[in-house]
Amino acid sequence: MAIGVEPLDAPVGAVVSGVDGRRSLSDRDFHRIEQVLLEHLVVVIPDLEDDVAWLLKFGHRFGPLVPHILTRFHHPKTPEMSIISANMDSGESRRTVKPAGAFWHSDLSYCRDPSDAIFLYATHVPSDGGDTLIANMQRVYEALPESLRKVIDGLTATHRYGWGGKGAITAPDPQRRAQYPDVVHPVVRVHARTGRRSLFVNPGYTMCINGVPGDESEAILEELFAHSQREEFCYRHRWAVGQLVAIDNRATLHRAMADYREPMRKLRMIVGCAERDTPGAGNLLN
């Protein structure tokens, strides 16, 4: 079956049909999916089997994979895949007040080499919620007032793991804190593949804008965060079992919705292909 592409009527996203999870993707089909991801920032592939090996192979086609910072999330077969679950009937999930990921963030923005893409596969879906919100940060940047764009172009921001999870993130112990020191990234990121600019700050991990007074930094970030969460920039993805969703992490933010009453929501997550040529990124702070 030929690959089909249907863009979503949303700020991001396209559904890709014709993918057979029982077979390896041809180079032609993979490059088609890759181009759709670059163009639409989110790719939804429905009706795939729960095949860990296939999912890992798909992720590896995009580049190296990065294990989750917390080993307790690692899949029992491989650290390259994580199990992100929220069973609110269990003590495990109650380590955090909210389900994991229930805050706006960009995966690994707290690392020297942020993630290029994440891949989420649904195995358990509540019937009454548990959606994922995704914001198009290219459109967010382009819609900023010109005066504000002039202020932030060329500035950098400091990112820290655990900074702003608001009850949906496990605070790192001293060993993890030493392993992941604060990092600096440009406030406006240039996409290495497309050259498009996007806003690269997020409430989950961005501490401050550098080179400006603290109160001014806080005011700018509050304005940028509020702007990025406006409805016209966001897509709300409703999960179905067997869906694989690829997200271009370089130009989006995302968050899980903690709005469901049923106990279980479970996704398999692959985080991958950390580039080492992000313009302006990577100065470690000690």
PLM ranges: what are they?
Residues 1-244, 250-286:
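Non-heme Fe(II) oxygenase catalytic core, chiefly the N-lobe of the double-stranded beta-helix
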